[in-house]
Amino acid sequence: MAYAAVLLDIEGTVCPISFVKESLFPFFLKQVDTLCSSQDLQVQRLLTQFQVDDVAGHIRSLVARDVKDPILKQLQGLVWENGYKDGQIKAPVYDDAIKFIKNSDVPVYIYSSGSVKAQKLLFQYVESRSNTLDLRPFIKGYFDINTSGVKTQSESYARIANNVGIKPNGVLFISDNPFELDAAKITGMQTMLAVRPGNSEVRDALKYNPVTNFDDL
């Protein structure tokens, strides 16, 4: 399989699918009331965009339903930044993914529903035997739903390919979500299904070119 760039999903692909829902979401939810009473201008500007009376309740509802809301994603990035910086959060990136990102012969890009800010934090504070590891120097660029669109729409992948200056058929996209892979494939991208512990079982997984370890790439 020849490709000129790799586009990676995060949750369920380079780190356990449980990390977001069992670590990041609970950390954020504990800060919702404090967030809503914050006098920070950036936070207030984001909160007013919800245009609802019960902002805290609305935020909790979005998180509970795992809604990919762009305003919510930006707020989460701001809250998680504090958690990463004070050592309360470390990202459990798979060892084989770390090795692949560090040693890839082609540019590595990230595409996640989480904000670009949250993505950079995750890769800046990767859990390792020596405290934390910063993978940002090895990652060429980041894309999210604000910059590129929803991950289940083919137009999003066309935008990314155009942005990186590589034809879609020269990009390999790896994700645990078959709907995302279907969307990417429409543009001509090469695709692989990430099969990791805890991921949902995918019907007809073989047709999605499954990979269980990035050492096999």
Swiss-Prot record:
A biological process term (GO) from this entry: L-methionine salvage from methylthioadenosine
Molecular function GO labels: acireductone synthase activity; magnesium ion binding
Positions annotated to bind substrate: 112-113, 151
Co-factor binding comment: Binds 1 Mg(2+) ion per subunit.
Associated pathway: Amino-acid biosynthesis; L-methionine biosynthesis via salvage pathway; L-methionine from S-methyl-5-thio-alpha-D-ribose 1-phosphate: step 3/6; Amino-acid biosynthesis; L-methionine biosynthesis via salvage pathway; L-methionine from S-methyl-5-thio-alpha-D-ribose 1-phosphate: step 4/6
Keywords: Amino-acid biosynthesis, Cytoplasm, Hydrolase, Magnesium, Metal-binding, Methionine biosynthesis, Nucleus
Catalyzed reactions: 5-methylsulfanyl-2,3-dioxopentyl phosphate + H2O = 1,2-dihydroxy-5-(methylsulfanyl)pent-1-en-3-one + phosphate
Assigned EC number: 3.1.3.77
List of residues binding Mg(2+): 9, 11, 176
Compartments, as annotated in UniProt: Cytoplasm; Nucleus
Main location: cytoplasm
Domain of life: Eukaryota
InterPro entries from the UniProt entry: Enolase-ppase_E1, ENOPH1_eukaryotes, HAD-like_sf, HAD_sf
Gene Ontology CC: cytoplasm; nucleus
A Pfam family reported for this protein in Swiss-Prot or TrEMBL: Hydrolase
Named cofactor requirement(s): Mg(2+)
Function per UniProt: Bifunctional enzyme that catalyzes the enolization of 2,3-diketo-5-methylthiopentyl-1-phosphate (DK-MTP-1-P) into the intermediate 2-hydroxy-3-keto-5-methylthiopentenyl-1-phosphate (HK-MTPenyl-1-P), which is then dephosphorylated to form the acireductone 1,2-dihydroxy-3-keto-5-methylthiopentene (DHK-MTPene).
Family: Belongs to the HAD-like hydrolase superfamily. MasA/MtnC family.
Quaternary structure note: Monomer.
Protein name: Enolase-phosphatase E1
Lineage, top ranks: Eukaryota, Fungi, Dikarya, Ascomycota, Saccharomycotina
